[in-house]
């Protein structure tokens, strides 16, 4: 898709947000990386009706006002009824994007997913994975977790990187 092709243009050389109150030249990453961050957020919200009401609500509620990024984050948190503060901190204030680290441990026919986020402290973004025809959410944190996946063909395992702007690393 158009959004995912933008990944090729991101250098991850600087955070999206620059240093305030100084003349700070940002990276061109801010455009593509910002677009990919919003694509990730839309998939985390996982409700297009809510997503588009948030986008329209930002326009309607903040017209004729001077706002900053925190005003927008607070609004998204309020309307979505979820706290995305750590998500925004990771994507806006740090040059590196979260890395999903994982391994699949085989025990006979059964397989166990061992996984975590390599990201800022308390980063706990849910993630969709796919086995065969089925997508399901997992809930990584900064600490390793294990999930029994049962028996399946290892070639059917897929991390939905088309929906999230992340790096992955198989350990």
What are the functions of these language-model segments?
Residues 162-171:
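Edge beta-strands of extracellular beta-sandwich domains
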Residues 1-118:
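Hydrophobic alpha-helical and helix-loop surface patches within well-folded domains
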Residues 84-85, 100, 104-161:
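Beta-strand-rich binding/interaction modules
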């Amino acid at each position: 898709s158009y959004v995912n092709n933008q990944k090729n243009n991101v250098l991850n050389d600087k955070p999206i947000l620059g240093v305030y109150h100084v003349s700070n030249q940002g990276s061109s990453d801010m455009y593509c990386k910002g677009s990919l961050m919003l694509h990730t957020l839309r998939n985390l919200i996982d409700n297009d009706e809510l997503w588009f009401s948030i986008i329209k609500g930002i326009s309607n509620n903040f017209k004729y006002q001077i706002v900053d990024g925190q005003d927008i984050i607070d609004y998204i948190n309020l309307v979505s009824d979820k706290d995305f503060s750590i998500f925004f901190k990771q994507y806006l204030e740090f040059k590196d994007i979260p890395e999903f680290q994982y391994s699949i441990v085989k025990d006979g026919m059964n397989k166990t997913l061992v996984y975590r986020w390599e990201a800022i402290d308390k980063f706990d973004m849910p993630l969709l994975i796919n086995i065969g025809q089925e997508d399901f959410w997992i809930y990584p944190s900064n600490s390793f977790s294990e999930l029994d996946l049962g028996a399946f063909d290892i070639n059917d395992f897929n991390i939905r990187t088309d929906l999230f702007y992340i790096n992955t690393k198989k350990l």
